Regions:
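Short, surface-exposed coil-to-beta transition loops
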Residues: 57-63, 134-139
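Extracytosolic low-complexity repeat regions of secreted or lipid-anchored proteins
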Residues: 106-127
């Protein structure tokens, strides 16, 4: 009995998808990346933050975040320059990004993590889970402040 060509393709795709490893880094790998970041001893910096997914009011909006002494001190929308009304506590420092990545890696919801090749801070974190807990965080335009 011959299988139709479309069925061969479907069987091949199932085989490929079944072999696809979508597991992100382990909690111990995230811990190693954090240690590399900490070696730089950067406590004052700014970056642009973009979250997509997560079903919150900040999703899809680029935000300029300023961190001084390892604490978020200011946050403004890049497009308008307006202050973010949600409060500074909802925006992460790099250390808090690592905290979230490590927790997600431990419970299996960290899908991917991309790092800056020089300073080893996360540039992108992808999370999988229920719709309100799935999405991507992107860090760009990072600069060390004096």
């Amino acid at each position: 009995m011959r299988l139709p060509a479309a069925r061969h393709v479907a069987i091949a795709l199932v085989g490929i998808l079944a072999c696809d490893d979508t597991t992100g880094p382990s909690a111990s790998q995230v811990e190693q990346y954090r240690a590399q970041w900490l070696e730089h001893q950067i406590h004052d910096y700014a970056y642009q933050y973009l979250s997509t997914g997560f079903f919150n009011s900040l999703s899809g909006q680029s935000i300029q975040v300023t961190v001084r002494a390892d604490t978020v001190r200011a946050a403004t929308f890049v497009a308008s320059g307006d202050t973010v009304p949600a409060g500074l506590a909802v925006l992460p420092t790099i250390a808090q990004l690592f905290d979230g990545a490590e927790a997600a890696a431990a419970n299996g919801t960290l899908k991917a993590m991309r790092l800056d090749p020089t300073l080893t801070y996360p540039t992108e974190l992808e999370f999988s889970g229920p719709p309100d807990a799935s999405g991507t965080l992107r860090i760009s335009h990072f600069q060390v402040l004096p």
